[in-house]
């Protein structure tokens, strides 16, 4: 990992592979297996050349997935192998060691394998694996047996009815009459139901039409009233003899604490408005 990687503290026991337990032949497991015909060094099961070493158990103290450490150890981890710049570094080392061609071929083969076997590659399946499980003979035989069973059941049920029934003709005629009566009742019910449905549709259409007519009458009446109001307004404006004179400003009432100021402003305005008074002030003679 290097200096930038996370530091993992490893703990090794006195006997990490538990060889003291596996080599101790005086225990119950060894004695029981030997009584069943097993000998030390043999594999378990039908195949004798299977693995003969015991399974190593390791404590999982990290959050990585199962098998991540094995993939990293075998060099098949994508995160480790796909790091940028490692291929160039391997080529440089190969040239320095005099094995540049071998390293280039190995890296090229590795790149091709990643493309073919990677997530963007394709995995083909043999055609023999995709054979159909349809068997025409067995299917036809199954259909034939099913039809035979059904016909046998029908024959047995009809035989039982013939044996148990003592009034065949009378029951059949009464049953036919009942069926005809039920059918006639059903037809009358359906007819009355259809009539009620048609009547309901007609009443709904009539109500919709009446609502529409009322709405149109109301709109026409409102338009007429608006038009009459507009015409009346125009007539009143035309019949008026003279336009309304603008309202004159009321004189300021000299009431209150501002009466003296109002009086002074009024006198000043009057003197300014008088041309003769202005000529006398500015000593202009005409």
From Swiss-Prot:
Sequence ranges of Basic and acidic residues compositional bias: 168-198
Region (Disordered), start-end ranges: 1-20, 148-255
UniProt feature, compositional bias: Basic residues: 199-230
Subcellular location: Nucleus, Nucleolus
Gene Ontology biological process: box C/D sno(s)RNA 3'-end processing; negative regulation of telomere maintenance via telomerase; rRNA processing
GO cellular component: nucleolus; nucleoplasm; small-subunit processome
Superkingdom of the source species: Eukaryota
A Pfam match: G-patch
MF terms (GO), sorted A to Z: enzyme activator activity; nucleic acid binding; telomerase inhibitor activity
Listed InterPro entries: G_patch_dom, PINX1
Keywords, in A-Z order: Nucleus, Ribosome biogenesis, rRNA processing
Residues making up the signal peptide according to the UniProt record: none
Residue ranges constituting the G-patch domain according to the UniProt record: 25-71
Family, as annotated: Belongs to the PINX1 family.
Function description: Involved in rRNA-processing at A0, A1 and A2 sites and negatively regulates telomerase.
Protein name: Protein PXR1
Species in which this protein is naturally found: Meyerozyma guilliermondii (strain ATCC 6260 / CBS 566 / DSM 6381 / JCM 1539 / NBRC 10279 / NRRL Y-324)
Gene: PXR1
């Amino acid at each position: 990992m290097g200096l930038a990687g996370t530091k993992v503290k490893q703990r090794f026991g006195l006997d990490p592979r538990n060889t003291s337990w596996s080599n101790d032949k005086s225990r119950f497991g060894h004695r029981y297996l030997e009584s069943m015909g097993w000998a030390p060094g043999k594999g378990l099961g039908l195949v004798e050349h299977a693995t003969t070493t015991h399974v190593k158990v390791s404590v999982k103290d990290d959050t990585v997935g199962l098998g991540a450490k094995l993939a990293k150890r075998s060099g098949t981890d994508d995160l480790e192998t796909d790091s940028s710049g490692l291929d160039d570094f391997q080529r440089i080392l190969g040239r320095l060691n005099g094995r540049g061609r071998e390293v280039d071929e190995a890296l090229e083969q590795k790149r091709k394998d990643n493309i073919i076997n990677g997530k963007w590659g394709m995995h083909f399946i043999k055609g023999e694996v995709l054979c159909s499980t349809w068997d025409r003979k067995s299917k036809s035989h199954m259909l034939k047996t099913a039809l035979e069973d059904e016909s046998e059941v029908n024959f047995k049920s009809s035989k039982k009815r013939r044996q148990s029934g003592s009034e065949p003709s009378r029951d059949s005629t009464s049953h036919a009459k009942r069926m005809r009566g039920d059918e006639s009742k059903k037809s009358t019910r359906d007819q009355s139901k259809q009539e009620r449905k048609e009547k309901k549709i007609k009443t709904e259409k009539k109500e919709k039409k009446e609502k529409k007519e009322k709405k149109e009458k109301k709109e026409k009446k409102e338009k007429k009233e608006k038009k009459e109001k507009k015409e009346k307004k125009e007539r009143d404006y035309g019949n008026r003899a003279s336009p309304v004179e603008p309202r004159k400003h009321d004189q300021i009432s000299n009431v209150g604490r501002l009466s003296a100021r109002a009086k002074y402003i009024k006198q000043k305005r009057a003197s300014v408005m008088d041309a003769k008074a202005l000529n006398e002030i500015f000593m202009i003679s005409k």
